[in-house]
């Protein structure tokens, strides 16, 4: 250890000791009987939507699917943020339409609100075209993502979905947030 560094460290230690001798222990002046606990409510700010936002007008079927996603999220005991991520994911994957087999236009064997694939273990075609089942399956995957509550929506959705277009989910965050705000308590 060089001499200058050692002298500096000794000076800092000496000042810390001297401060304690002259000032005395600070906690000794406080009266623990008078101490009152202070409750502080802290609510994490909702993340701001990333990038340009898209919006579509929903028909009755799509609105029913929004409500089904919210109901499944509540049933799973998850917060509104999980519903926002789920709805944004479904907006990207199917525009909130419960898609069956699309023939030649289909991406492999992807089905339902989340374009889940039976061959990837999401469930049977009948299961993944059931909005409650497909949402619950998506939420099960979301729960396995460490820190999903605090990460950008597109990152959380992509970790579950493993899409060829990982950033595409972000464009639906504002509409998903608005839909959850509109239907969560209805």
Regions found by a protein language model. Give the residues of each.
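N-terminal export and membrane-targeting signals
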Residues: 1-16
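C-terminal region of N-terminal signal peptides and the immediate post-cleavage residues
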Residues: 20-44
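Export/targeting segments at the very N-terminus of extracytoplasmic proteins
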Residues: 46-91, 95, 183
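Peptidoglycan-targeting cell-wall enzymes and recognition modules
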Residues: 49-56, 94-153, 162
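Soluble non-cytosolic domains of exported or imported proteins
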Residues: 56-64, 76-84, 125-133, 150-154, ...
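Extracytoplasmic/secreted envelope proteins and their assembly/folding machinery
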Residues: 63-70, 83-87, 113, 132-139, ...
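Short acidic/histidine-centered micro-motifs embedded in hydrophobic/aromatic stretches
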Residues: 88-92, 156-159, 163
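Extracellularly exposed regions in secreted/surface proteins, prominently low-complexity, repeat-rich
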Residues: 165-186
């Amino acid at each position: 250890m060089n001499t200058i560094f050692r002298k500096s460290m000794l000076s800092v230690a000496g000042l810390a000791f001297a401060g304690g001798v002259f000032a005395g222990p600070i906690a000794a002046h406080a009266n623990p009987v008078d101490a009152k606990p202070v409750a502080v409510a802290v609510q994490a700010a909702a993340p701001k939507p990333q990038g340009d936002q898209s919006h579509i007008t929903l028909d009755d079927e799509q609105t029913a699917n929004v409500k089904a996603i919210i109901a499944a999220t509540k049933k799973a005991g998850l917060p509104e943020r999980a519903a926002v991520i789920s709805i944004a994911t479904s907006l990207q994957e199917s525009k909130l339409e419960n898609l069956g087999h699309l023939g030649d236009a289909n991406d492999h064997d992807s089905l339902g609100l989340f374009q889940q694939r039976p061959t990837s273990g999401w469930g049977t075609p009948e299961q993944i075209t059931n909005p409650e089942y497909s949402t619950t399956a998506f939420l099960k995957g979301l729960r396995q993502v460490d820190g999903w509550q605090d990460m950008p929506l597109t990152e959380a959705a992509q970790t579950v979905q493993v899409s060829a277009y990982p950033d595409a989910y972000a464009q639906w965050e504002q509409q998903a947030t608005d839909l959850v705000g509109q239907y969560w308590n209805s």
